[in-house]
Structure formats: C-alpha cells, structure tokens
Amino acid sequence: MRFVMPGDRIGSAEEYVKGEGVYEEGGELFAAVAGKLIIKDRVAKVESISPIPEIVKGDVVLGRVVDLRNSIALIEVSSKKGENRGPSNRGIGILHVSNVDEGYVKEISEAVGYLDILKARVIGDNLRLSTKEEEMGVLRALCSNCKTEMVREGDILKCPECGRVEKRKISTDYGKGEW
C-alpha cells in the first residue's frame, strides 16, 4: 500500500480496473482523493483518509435557490450540517410547495426567492427537501428589486436600501451567520 494524492497516476486502464476513489482519463487511472492505494484482484481503489460525507434522509443541509417554478424550488445543495467538507452527493434538491410550511402556501415564491440561502431537512431520495420545522427556512435573502441583503422585521423581510417588504419562510437562525 502507498499513500496517494488527488491526481497521482496509479497505472493504466489495461493494468487495473477502476475502483472507488479512482478516475480514468485517456486510458490512465488517477487518484480522485487523498488516501491509501489498495490494489486487490486487479481493482485499484483509494481509501480516503477522511471519508467524504453522504447526504441521507434526515440530514440538515444548506443550499441556494437556483430556480423557481409554480410549485417547486430547485436548491443547489452545498453543505451537510456537522461536516467540514462538502458531501459527495451534493447536487440539486427539490423543495415542493407542500413541504414548505405547516400552513397552506399557494405558490413557492411566497416562501423562498431566487438566490436565497436556506436550511432544509432531507425527507426522501433524490434530495427531496422540507422547511416545515421552525428552524428550517431562509437564512439569507436578497431584495428582489435592488439585490441588497434583507433585514428581518418580525415575520417579514425589509430591504434597508429601497424599503421593499417581502415575505419568506424565515428560519429562526435568519441573519445570525450560523446554521
């Protein structure tokens, strides 16, 4: 066994079969993560020195709203709570209007806005998300008019620059810089 760093050449694709932690480029195999190189039965894999976290049902994640439709928001998931490094299965999560709040929400745009940063719980496969819990919801929002960061005033958000008032599903951690 030897220690390898990301990008280190392991061998050719003719010599070994690509395993976990290894990628192939131009017929050559390279380490995708830092760790111990293990070759067994002609399968080359790299065992990471610090495992890459995976997002599973029940986890709390941080993400940014990248698209809004009538009944869903697409959330670019970037972090998993309690982990110092990004998860391996980060991607686009789906927040359906029925999973926003305990009360009735007609359209998703009543609860989240484009580029909002939010905290959500994973409730199913394919990164299905929910913000129904009190501490889940928008952590940071930009004014849809002038893009200034909104300030919380009770149950609403107000733009300190242009005075615009907007409604969101606000997290209890809004504006605290923590999640």
From Swiss-Prot:
Compartments in which it is found: Cytoplasm
Main location class: cytoplasm
GO cellular component, one term: cytoplasm
UniProt GO MF annotations: RNA binding; zinc ion binding
Annotated ranges, domain S1 motif: 58-137
Pfam families with a match to the protein in the record: ECR1_N, EXOSC1
Entry remark concerning the domains of this protein: Contains an N-terminal domain that mediates interactions with the hexameric ring, a central S1 domain and a C-terminal zinc-ribbon domain.
Record-stated family: Belongs to the CSL4 family.
Subunit structure: Component of the archaeal exosome complex. Forms a trimer of Rrp4 and/or Csl4 subunits. The trimer associates with a hexameric ring-like arrangement composed of 3 Rrp41-Rrp42 heterodimers. Interacts with DnaG.
Protein known as: Exosome complex component Csl4
The species this protein was found in: Archaeoglobus fulgidus (strain ATCC 49558 / DSM 4304 / JCM 9628 / NBRC 100126 / VC-16)
Phylogenetic classification of the source organism: Archaea, Methanobacteriati, Methanobacteriota, Archaeoglobi, Archaeoglobales
